[in-house]
């Protein structure tokens, strides 16, 4: 069985070279907000306000929705982030994943759940672990963002069905 695969490099906010409803699966991991300079002009996230960061990501989700075939999937790997006190006057967790879910649902992508990707082990295998700090002051616990989400979305409509030959070859 012969298949064709094309790699197109460009800005995901404007995927003009990719026809409407021509992609069957999108897997993406957007740039982190304010954490990494990727060294490209007009990059998303670095030196952006949070609002601009989310607006740029929303342009990406709109383009993903346009190129995604009906009934097919978008998978987004994203982690929430601590906001520095410079931005909010205090430290807090910014739930970026919830912004993505809200926008994608608004443009017609159904949220199908998430996979939690535990990036490091936090299990104390020696048996002496503590939860939320240590006795007698557990209220001073440290929250670690050592996981990311893999958000799963499905575009409304009927997905293309594999042929008998495709099934047999798989």
Predicted regions and their residues:
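Core catalytic lobe of class I
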Residues: 1-170
């Amino acid at each position: 069985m012969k298949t064709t695969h094309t790699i197109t490099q460009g800005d995901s906010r404007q995927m003009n070279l990719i026809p409407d409803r021509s992609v069957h699966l999108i897997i993406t991991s957007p740039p982190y907000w304010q954490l990494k300079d990727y060294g490209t002009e007009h990059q998303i996230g670095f030196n952006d306000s949070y609002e601009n960061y989310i607006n740029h990501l929303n342009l990406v989700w709109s383009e993903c929705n346009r190129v995604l075939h009906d009934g097919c999937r978008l998978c987004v790997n994203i982690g929430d982030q601590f906001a520095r006190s410079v931005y909010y006057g205090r430290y807090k967790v910014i739930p970026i994943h919830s912004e993505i879910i809200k926008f994608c649902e608004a443009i017609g992508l159904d949220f199908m759940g998430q996979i939690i990707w535990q990036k490091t082990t936090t299990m104390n295998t020696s048996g002496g672990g503590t939860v939320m700090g240590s006795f007698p002051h557990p209220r001073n616990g440290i929250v670690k963002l050592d996981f990311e989400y893999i958000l799963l979305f499905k575009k409304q409509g009927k997905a293309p069905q594999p042929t008998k030959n495709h099934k047999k070859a798989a």
